[in-house]
């Protein structure tokens, strides 16, 4: 009985904490107090990149949860709403997001848009050579994606251009050390 009470007490504390920390069902772009532009990204990978470069100057909104397969992910109506309400949409490109490509191309910017065909690797898929969308395995391509992301963020929040440029320079230096 004591174990059950302890369990229920811990569960109650966790639920209270989650309720206190959560927002009212996602971001509210019409909120008067909401000053940061919203950057919607497709993956946790890009979410981390935007955080490194822009920090708290933007609000990040993630579409595909960590652990989900982006190649197979099917957008929900809430995802489409995120795309519509975003001030900037960033996605991998190279058909990484599979079934969401059409919606993303209409509204977003692929961080891989500056990649040349000769730089992009290929992989075998069902006996065919196809573009390998996993650019982060190539540090030079990843750095190009960081620069593209930085450019887009500086255009979005021009008052913070110098901080984003500084963060980009530091992040690229960290990548050079890898």
Residue ranges of each PLM-predicted region?
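Positively charged n-region of N-terminal signal peptides that target proteins for export
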Residues: 1-7
């Amino acid at each position: 009985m004591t174990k059950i009470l302890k369990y229920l007490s811990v569960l109650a504390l966790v639920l209270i904490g989650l309720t206190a920390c959560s927002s009212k069902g996602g971001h509210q772009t019409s909120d008067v107090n909401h000053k940061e532009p919203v950057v919607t990204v497709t993956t946790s990978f890009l979410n981390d990149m935007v955080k490194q470069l822009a920090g708290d100057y933007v609000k990040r909104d993630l579409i595909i949860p960590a652990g989900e397969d982006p190649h197979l992910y099917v957008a929900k109506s809430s995802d489409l709403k995120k795309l519509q309400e975003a001030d900037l949409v960033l996605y991998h490109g190279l058909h990484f997001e599979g079934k969401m490509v059409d919606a993303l191309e209409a509204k977003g910017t692929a961080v891989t848009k500056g990649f040349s065909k000769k730089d992009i690797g290929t992989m075998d898929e069902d006996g065919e050579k196809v573009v390998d969308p996993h650019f982060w395995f190539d540090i030079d391509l990843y750095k190009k994606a960081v620069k593209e992301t930085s450019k887009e963020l500086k255009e979005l929040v021009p008052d913070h251009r110098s901080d984003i440029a500084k963060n980009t320079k530091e992040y690229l230096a960290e990548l050079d050390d890898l």
